[in-house]
């Protein structure tokens, strides 16, 4: 039996912390699907990058991992996990502050899909302070992103904010 997992998230943008979790999850499972969530219509918080841009950035960051695929999905993560045959959903934990939310989310997933387990991986300590929101703020203000995101993501952020300033 092949063990599949889904690592869902907005990934707006993918960070080195995300890449770290993906690399480690890819060692634990036969196949890992990184699910880029695209269902933001009507929500107050809109992503900076489109779903297809986020997919492209993630694919470039993860192309060295042969057992990882990047998809775009909308709807419930547990429904998508079932649709792709995943037995587990991977979640990354940066700090104790993430735990309460992830704990509640895991119980909701369990309620909705008892057949899908949740596996939480602690981020490596050098990435424990990184969040996509923080990365976007640093990029917008012209800060140094070295070591925080893959180089191509840093370049995409610079270009995106240049474009937004022109508009």
Swiss-Prot record:
Residues that coordinate or bind ATP: 10-11, 18, 92-94, 102, 127-133
Record key words, sorted: ATP-binding, Coenzyme A biosynthesis, Cytoplasm, Magnesium, Nucleotide-binding, Nucleotidyltransferase, Transferase
Primary subcellular site in the record, as a coarse category: cytoplasm
GO cellular component, one term: cytoplasm
Family listed: Belongs to the bacterial CoaD family.
One GO BP annotation of this record: coenzyme A biosynthetic process
Localisation per UniProt entry: Cytoplasm
Binding site for substrate: 10, 77, 91
A GO MF label: ATP binding
Pfam families for the chain: CTP_transf_like
UniProt catalytic activity: (R)-4'-phosphopantetheine + ATP + H(+) = 3'-dephospho-CoA + diphosphate
Cofactors: Mg(2+)
Assembly notes: Homohexamer.
Function, in words: Reversibly transfers an adenylyl group from ATP to 4'-phosphopantetheine, yielding dephospho-CoA (dPCoA) and pyrophosphate.
EC numbers: 2.7.7.3
Stated name of the protein: Phosphopantetheine adenylyltransferase
Site note Transition state stabilizer, residues: 18
Signal peptide: none
HAMAP family the record matches: PPAT_bact
Keyword Phosphoprotein: no
Pathway(s) of this molecule: Cofactor biosynthesis; coenzyme A biosynthesis; CoA from (R)-pantothenate: step 4/5
InterPro entries in the record: Cyt_trans-like, PPAT, Rossmann-like_a/b/a_fold
